[in-house]
């Protein structure tokens, strides 16, 4: 009810195509928020899933396949020093923010309007009413004391970004951004904005 309208219920998918319960056909640009980069019902992927399931469903402990995947990721993205596998994007963000706060001893997080980072309390925050303001809760159940630790800025506003770092830079544990944000109609950031943000992060 909170988002309005009637949600689509999907019945099946094949490749890049999905069908809803009424038989309407869509191109799937979501890909289950990332994991389905090979599309729906991919024969090779299905075969590997079945092969793996025959050796057990879930162990709740590390496996050889996790180590092999970690090595593959490291080979293709060599600047990654450490990695951790989790069950959802929300857990990944939650872990990253906790690590940043623990390592820096700082508490504030900077995020940007329209970017989605899971159901972490400190990410369910919208911009306040002032020019540079602490965030306010956008979801019932998120205390304002938690929301107040999150700064929220509009995308591509370089002046506000500079002002925010001047005011809060020494209190920030981390900055989180979605370079290709699906929830705001793919409002892409300017390269100069991202470069400025990267430089400010290194500086502070």
Predicted feature locations:
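PLP-dependent aminotransferase-class I/II
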Residues: 117-180, 188
């Amino acid at each position: 009810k909170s988002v309005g309208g009637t949600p689509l219920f999907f019945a099946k998918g094949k490749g890049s195509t999905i069908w809803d319960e009424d038989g309407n056909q869509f191109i799937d640009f979501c890909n289950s928020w990332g994991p389905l980069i090979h599309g729906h019902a991919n024969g090779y992927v299905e075969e590997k899933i079945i092969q793996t399931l025959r050796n057990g469903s879930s162990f709740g402990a590390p496996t050889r396949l996790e180590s092999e995947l970690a090595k593959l990721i490291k080979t293709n993205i060599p600047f990654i020093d450490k990695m951790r596998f989790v069950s959802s994007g929300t857990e990944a963000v939650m872990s990253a923010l906790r690590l940043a706060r623990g390592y820096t001893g700082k508490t504030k997080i900077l995020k940007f309007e329209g970017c989605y980072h899971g159901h972490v309390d400190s990410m369910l925050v919208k911009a306040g009413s002032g020019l540079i303001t602490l965030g306010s809760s956008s979801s019932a159940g998120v205390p304002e004391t938690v929301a107040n630790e999150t700064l929220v800025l509009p995308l591509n506003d370089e002046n506000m970004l500079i002002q925010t770092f001047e005011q809060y830079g020494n209190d920030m544990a981390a900055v989180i951004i979605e370079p290709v944000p699906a929830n705001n109609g793919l409002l892409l950031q300017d390269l100069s904005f991202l470069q400025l943000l990267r430089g400010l992060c290194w500086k502070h």
